[in-house]
Amino acid sequence: MKSAAVVNYAPEKGSVEIREIDKPEIGEEDVLLEVVNVGVCGSDLHQWTADHSWHVNYPVVLGHEFGGHIVALGSRVTGWKEGDRVVSETAAVIDPNSPMTKSGLYNLDPSRKGFGYGVNGAMTKYVRVPARCLHRVPDQLAFEQACLTEPCCVAFNAVVENSRLKPGDRVIVLGPGTIGILCAAMARLCGAEVAIVGLEADKHRLDIAK
């Protein structure tokens, strides 16, 4: 069975096209996810315009901010069932013996490969996902919002974990992109006074940020 996919097939600018790809085969610790929604990250655009700084395993299906329904499970997968609504983390391949992985910082594992550049991502119908990457999505939460889980985590890490804001702090966010707006939202949840600064071209985004 084949499905349409958004494929980044070469390092040259504009090397993205729709291709037919085979349905992925899963390993014993993987699930097969039927994709419902997938976000377009700035890194997807950078690969399209060929101004990225990371190694890409061409050809590769783009997309790493995604969610969907489990449609098949590997033989060693527990705690999940077909039909479960989930989102995925981005670290598709990690070394379990890496010091970073062992300390819980698997996102900093030097051998890490992410969806959309290291392995096939989710801009297609089906994607193979390690079960360790999954997080459950409540029934009342739409996938359009659930697919913002990864950028929300970026904002949480920046604002809550690293900046350690306190109620009453005053914060300026430079740039009303997705991450900037989410950082502003996190800062407000921490009790800070927040201002977002942008350019004239950002007027629509600043309106959204309000």
What are these language model-derived features?
Residues 24-38, 51-97, 138-140:
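Glycine-rich beta-strand-centered segment in the early N-terminal region that forms part
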Residues 1-6:
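Short structural boundary motif marking the start of a folded domain
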Residues 141-210:
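Mid-domain Rossmann-like dinucleotide-binding core that forms the NAD(H)/NADP(H) cofactor-binding site
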Residues 43-49:
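Cytochrome P450 core scaffold surrounding the K-helix E-X-X-R motif
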Residues 10, 36, 73, 176, ...:
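Cofactor-binding loop segments of dinucleotide-utilizing enzymes, especially the Rossmann-like FAD-
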Residues 41, 80, 90-135:
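Cysteine-cluster motifs in flexible loop/terminal segments that predominantly coordinate metals
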Residues 133-143:
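Glycine/charged-rich beta-loop-alpha catalytic/anionic-binding loops adjacent to active sites
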